[in-house]
Amino acid sequence: MGELFRSEEMTLAQLFLQSEAAYCCVSELGELGKVQFRDLNPDVNVFQRKFVNEVRRCEEMDRKLRFVEKEIRKANIPIMDTGENPEVPFPRDMIDLEANFEKIENELKEINTNQEALKRNFLELTELKFILRKTQQFFDEAELHHQQMADPDLLEESSSLLEPNEMGRGAPLRLGFVAGVINRERIPTFERMLWRVCRGNVFLRQAEIENPLEDPVTGDYVHKSVFIIFFQGDQLKNRVKKICEGFRASLYPCPETPQERKEMASGVNTRIDDLQMVLNQTEDHRQRVLQAAAKNIRVWFIKVRKMKAIYHTLNLCNIDVTQKCLIAEVWCPVTDLDSIQFALRRGTEHSGSTVPSILNRMQTNQTPPTYNKTNKFTHGFQNIVDAYGIGTYREINPAPYTVITFPFLFAVMFGDFGHGILMTLFAVWMVLRESRILSQKHENEMFSMVFSGRYIILLMGLFSIYTGLIYNDCFSKSLNIFGSSWSVRPMFTQGNWTEETLLGSSVLQLNPAIPGVFGGPYPFGIDPIWNIATNKLTFLNSFKMKMSVILGIIHMLFGVSLSLFNHIYFKKPLNIYFGFIPEIIFMSSLFGYLVILIFYKWTAYDAHSSRNAPSLLIHFINMFLFSYPESGNAMLYSGQKGIQCFLIVVAMLCVPWMLLFKPLILRHQYLRKKHLGTLNFGGIRVGNGPTEEDAEIIQHDQLSTHSEDAEEFDFGDTMVHQAIHTIEYCLGCISNTASYLRLWALSLAHAQLSEVLWTMVIHIGLHVRSLAGGLGLFFIFAAFATLTVAILLIMEGLSAFLHALRLHWVEFQNKFYTGTGFKFLPFSFEHIREGKFDE
């Protein structure tokens, strides 16, 4: 099996990096993205590592850049993204970057502070302008109110606002007032509070400000209203001011005479004009600063986060006692060792160091990470497999087979020619525009997820077209491409049909045994005549049910066969002789035999003998019961009873074959090894004497948690494990075969939903023969298209997708795929280059 079908061969290597070259070497390795660093300081606190100060400086620069980015986005300035991949700055360049970011941050903060103060002043002047504009009307109304209060007829009603001695003298009444501005939504509550606290002894007038005013702190526009409150006495004045303060109303001085108000308004307008000019200049300066930053901020982000990633990686390394060398351990693919060596040489040259960096391969029994190379086409399918579990190192990778089997099984459930075309067109659109979509960096998580599976959707659509043609199903209707192979005419000429037969029967059955009625199989797929047959569902159910069983058993047998390649590669002959062979015999003797029976029945019985065809279900049940009644179900072939009894006995013998032999042989081997004293020690291979290379290797003691240390053999545990595996496999063969019937069930459900949608929606519009019907068809078709996309494409498509996922994860992969590995996570700048800064 080639590398396509297995994970890459990995090796553990030791890097010796000179202190002055370590930064540049790690930078080159990050650009290459082919090595995974191991933490050699697991017991050291992150705040006590050597490069923690550099990491903090990078985080501080990152914070400043995020502040600048926030200001840029707030100003709606587009951030330029040229796709440039800047080189990592040298450590000495960090000071210049820090100074630059500090300058930009301080400048923006100063501008924001000044702008906020100016806007607050501008808001106050604007509110004062509206107060002066509205007060004349308020004062006129107050004067009228005052005259009414002085009227003897109204004297008793207004007594609460008049002092007793003034009432006696009839002296003129002087009212105090306050004017201000308040948020419009607070006016009703404000008015009720004034009325209750002041007991109705105040006169409130308010008017809305037509244009919303900008809040200097938040930048939001707020609707406000001008108010003026008339009262008498200092006690009411204090109450009114406290209420205004509680409602966060802004109070402003307002002259009493019209002349003074006019002069003040003139001065306010002049100050507003001057302030507006200063505000415009401040905003222009802020825009220039932000636009200049927007051109470079993406590059700055990449530089800073590359530096941070490098220093974080350097913190994983050990430092020798001389402080002149950093020691790192990395997992890397064997095929990429040359490119890694070249990257180290390049990094050493960039740093100006004269001492080369050294890469030394190490021998270890630790389990390496699993690394499957993918491209943009296979990446989605590999993600489907990895979602179940990361493959064990070097075991068979299901992804290459999933590329075909997953969309095919999806299409078996989804098969519809029309729906397949719609799905394919959507996928083709995403594939053709993938460069533009990738450059736009969509933040919509749902669309990003769909886009990442564009090639999966493309194949699902293409296979749906294929299965739709086989089912001859296009939006629940059949396509009569080649003409039906069935003919009615021979039923009149050679059969016993007459005109009276047609008139007297609502349903008639064509007899394929009569020559000429059935002209042979349809060239491709199902004959379109079945679309109008009353027994269409009976025929399709039988066909799809048997097809589901056949596909399921073939799929599972293929999975069991793949386990053979794992056993051969890992040199486990016991698993072949006492695992693979009995498993394949068990499944083939029972369910493989069922597939043979299905094909045999299809070929052995024709139109003349189909009435005598026995039931496969009854035969299969009788096979397990060893029951063969002479009356009822006839035998399919001669010698059937003996063959079926033989197959059952063989299948039953496979159970102890799988259950007992392997644990007993392992126990015998263990006792023999124990007797000879040839057990392995530790996790590192030990020979007669360490070579020079081995002596260097044994110095490191940071063993991974994934190491496969030799353990004491426990016969009981082995026996229990083998019993669980045997029971799971034997019962799984039955349950998994039944599970594949979901192919039939979902295909039936999809076809029926499609037919219901056609009958209940589009059929109505097509049967109205008038101008109104033509106009109505436009809206009916819109509803039909919407329901087709929402229900049949999205909901049914998602359902079929999940069921296909289940069939691969459980029914297929559990035959050969353990999925207990851990993923290869190389140190790479790729996610930084793509703008995924938060990862």
Curated annotation (Swiss-Prot):
<dbReference type="GO" id="GO:0030665">
    <property type="term" value="C:clathrin-coated vesicle membrane"/>
</dbReference>
<dbReference type="Pfam" id="PF01496">
    <property type="entry name" value="V_ATPase_I"/>
</dbReference>
<feature type="modified residue" description="Phosphothreonine">
    <location>
        <position position="257"/>
    </location>
</feature>
<keyword id="KW-0406">Ion transport</keyword>
<feature type="topological domain" description="Vacuolar">
    <location>
        <begin position="479"/>
        <end position="542"/>
    </location>
</feature>
<dbReference type="GO" id="GO:0005794">
    <property type="term" value="C:Golgi apparatus"/>
</dbReference>
<comment type="subunit">
    <text>V-ATPase is a heteromultimeric enzyme made up of two complexes: the ATP-hydrolytic V1 complex and the proton translocation V0 complex. The V1 complex consists of three catalytic AB heterodimers that form a heterohexamer, three peripheral stalks each consisting of EG heterodimers, one central rotor including subunits D and F, and the regulatory subunits C and H. The proton translocation complex V0 consists of the proton transport subunit a, a ring of proteolipid subunits c9c'', rotary subunit d, subunits e and f, and the accessory subunits ATP6AP1/Ac45 and ATP6AP2/PRR. Interacts with SPAAR.</text>
</comment>
<keyword id="KW-1133">Transmembrane helix</keyword>
<dbReference type="GO" id="GO:0016241">
    <property type="term" value="P:regulation of macroautophagy"/>
</dbReference>
<feature type="transmembrane region" description="Helical">
    <location>
        <begin position="773"/>
        <end position="811"/>
    </location>
</feature>
<keyword id="KW-0770">Synapse</keyword>
<feature type="transmembrane region" description="Helical">
    <location>
        <begin position="581"/>
        <end position="601"/>
    </location>
</feature>
<keyword id="KW-0597">Phosphoprotein</keyword>
<keyword id="KW-0472">Membrane</keyword>
<feature type="transmembrane region" description="Helical">
    <location>
        <begin position="727"/>
        <end position="751"/>
    </location>
</feature>
<dbReference type="GO" id="GO:0097401">
    <property type="term" value="P:synaptic vesicle lumen acidification"/>
</dbReference>
<dbReference type="InterPro" id="IPR002490">
    <property type="entry name" value="V-ATPase_116kDa_su"/>
</dbReference>
<feature type="topological domain" description="Vacuolar">
    <location>
        <begin position="752"/>
        <end position="772"/>
    </location>
</feature>
<dbReference type="GO" id="GO:0000220">
    <property type="term" value="C:vacuolar proton-transporting V-type ATPase, V0 domain"/>
</dbReference>
<dbReference type="InterPro" id="IPR026028">
    <property type="entry name" value="V-type_ATPase_116kDa_su_euka"/>
</dbReference>
<protein>
    <recommendedName>
        <fullName>V-type proton ATPase 116 kDa subunit a 1</fullName>
    </recommendedName>
</protein>
<feature type="topological domain" description="Cytoplasmic">
    <location>
        <begin position="1"/>
        <end position="395"/>
    </location>
</feature>
<keyword id="KW-0375">Hydrogen ion transport</keyword>
<feature type="transmembrane region" description="Helical">
    <location>
        <begin position="417"/>
        <end position="433"/>
    </location>
</feature>
<dbReference type="GO" id="GO:0005829">
    <property type="term" value="C:cytosol"/>
</dbReference>
<keyword id="KW-0968">Cytoplasmic vesicle</keyword>
<feature type="topological domain" description="Cytoplasmic">
    <location>
        <begin position="812"/>
        <end position="839"/>
    </location>
</feature>
<feature type="transmembrane region" description="Helical">
    <location>
        <begin position="647"/>
        <end position="666"/>
    </location>
</feature>
<dbReference type="GO" id="GO:0005886">
    <property type="term" value="C:plasma membrane"/>
</dbReference>
<dbReference type="GO" id="GO:0016607">
    <property type="term" value="C:nuclear speck"/>
</dbReference>
<dbReference type="GO" id="GO:0048471">
    <property type="term" value="C:perinuclear region of cytoplasm"/>
</dbReference>
<feature type="topological domain" description="Cytoplasmic">
    <location>
        <begin position="667"/>
        <end position="726"/>
    </location>
</feature>
<feature type="transmembrane region" description="Helical">
    <location>
        <begin position="449"/>
        <end position="478"/>
    </location>
</feature>
<dbReference type="GO" id="GO:0030672">
    <property type="term" value="C:synaptic vesicle membrane"/>
</dbReference>
<feature type="topological domain" description="Cytoplasmic">
    <location>
        <begin position="434"/>
        <end position="448"/>
    </location>
</feature>
<comment type="similarity">
    <text>Belongs to the V-ATPase 116 kDa subunit family.</text>
</comment>
<feature type="transmembrane region" description="Helical">
    <location>
        <begin position="543"/>
        <end position="562"/>
    </location>
</feature>
<feature type="transmembrane region" description="Helical">
    <location>
        <begin position="396"/>
        <end position="414"/>
    </location>
</feature>
<keyword id="KW-0812">Transmembrane</keyword>
<feature type="topological domain" description="Vacuolar">
    <location>
        <begin position="602"/>
        <end position="646"/>
    </location>
</feature>
<feature type="modified residue" description="Phosphotyrosine">
    <location>
        <position position="371"/>
    </location>
</feature>
<dbReference type="GO" id="GO:0051117">
    <property type="term" value="F:ATPase binding"/>
</dbReference>
